[in-house]
Each structure stands twice: as C-alpha cells, then as structure tokens.
Amino acid sequence: MDESLADLRQELLALLCRDAYRAGDFTLSSGQKSQYYINCKPVTLSARGAYLVGRLFLEQLAPEAVAVAGLTLGADPLVVAVSVLSNLAGQDRAALIVRKEAKGHGTMSFIEGPPLPQGAVVTVLEDVITTGGSALKAVGRLQEAGYVVNEVLGIVDRQGGGAAAFAAQGIPLRSLFQISDLEAYLNRT
C-alpha cells in the first residue's frame, strides 16, 4: 500500500474523534475527574484502527527495540498490531503483554510473550496517557524482569503529568497525538 504517514495519521485522528472521544462527566483510572473520556479500544480493536496504530507506532520505534510491551488490556491490541506489522516489514519485533497482577497458576508470571535475553530493549506502548500510572506499572515489571525500557509511545497524551512522570524515571514519552489535536479536530468538524 502506498499511503503516506501523514494520511494515515489524519485517518487515525478522525477515527479517534468519531469512535473513542466522549464528552461528559467521567472519573479516570487515575481517580481524576474529567469532562471527556477517550476509550481507544473501539478503534484499536477494529481492523483498520489496529493497522493505523501499528503502522504509525512501527515508524517511530527505535532500531534497538527488539520488542513492544504494554499493560493489559488497553495495550494488548497495540503490541500485537506492531508486532505483526513488524514481521511483515522484516523486522520481527516481539509482543509482550504485562499483567496487572501475577498469574495465579502455572508460571505465576507478570509478563506473557516470547522469552527475551536479559538487557533486551523494549518499548512500552499505551493507548491514553494521563498521569502515566499504567505505563509506569508496565515499565516497572519489565525492568524487574531484566529488560531495558527505552521509551514509551502513546496514542493520545491527555497532558495530565504523564510526560513529567516518565522524565523523572529517565524514560522519554512520545505520542501520536496530544489532546489538543483531538480538540482542534473536533472544533473543525
């Protein structure tokens, strides 16, 4: 397919505004109150949305990252999309899913996915970042397992302190969109 990244980004923005953004009174996972909510799952669990996110994230991955990971459930479709598209592009980056709690049976592990060597570089993916709490939990679990987290990539940064929380850990945050991008698009339509 001969699609420009700018066109893919615009298409994803339109999908997010149509299918993920909701106005109203909400309590976020951080406990904060908000006048809007962004649920990316209707987008990232659709075939086209998964493709768009996967392509755009794959283009941003550092060459040294051998895997992508994220906290279940929001990051599950993200890591799978990037991993599958990486294989099609000849890059073969593994997908890791980080559990919120250790599995209560079998291996009792926090991380599901193919085994990687100690020191393997992993990029954490997140759908929506507010304070960064969910992604930081994934970062901690990955570091405890002996992996090196090089950065966090998000779909939407709500600009609620997440970037500062990652910076305090020495981990860069990059996002496909800021909340201001969604607001500007919604104001135009």
From Swiss-Prot:
Signal peptide: none annotated. Transmembrane segments: none annotated. 5-phospho-alpha-D-ribose 1-diphosphate binds at residues 99-100, 103, 105, 126-134. The keyword GTP-binding does not apply. Its EC number is 2.4.2.10. InterPro entries: OPRT, Or_phspho_trans_dom, PRibTrfase_dom, PRTase-like. Its cofactor is Mg(2+). Pathway: Pyrimidine metabolism; UMP biosynthesis via de novo pathway; UMP from orotate: step 1/2. It is an enzyme of class 2 (transferase). GO terms for molecular function: magnesium ion binding; orotate phosphoribosyltransferase activity. It catalyses: orotidine 5'-phosphate + diphosphate = orotate + 5-phospho-alpha-D-ribose 1-diphosphate. Orotate binds at residues 130, 158. One of its GO terms (biological process) is 'de novo' UMP biosynthetic process. CDD domains: PRTases_typeI. Coiled coil: none annotated. Keywords: Glycosyltransferase, Magnesium, Pyrimidine biosynthesis, Transferase. Gene3D superfamilies: 3.40.50.2020. Belongs to the purine/pyrimidine phosphoribosyltransferase family. PyrE subfamily. Catalyzes the transfer of a ribosyl phosphate group from 5-phosphoribose 1-diphosphate to orotate, leading to the formation of orotidine monophosphate (OMP). Homodimer. HAMAP family: PyrE. This is Orotate phosphoribosyltransferase.
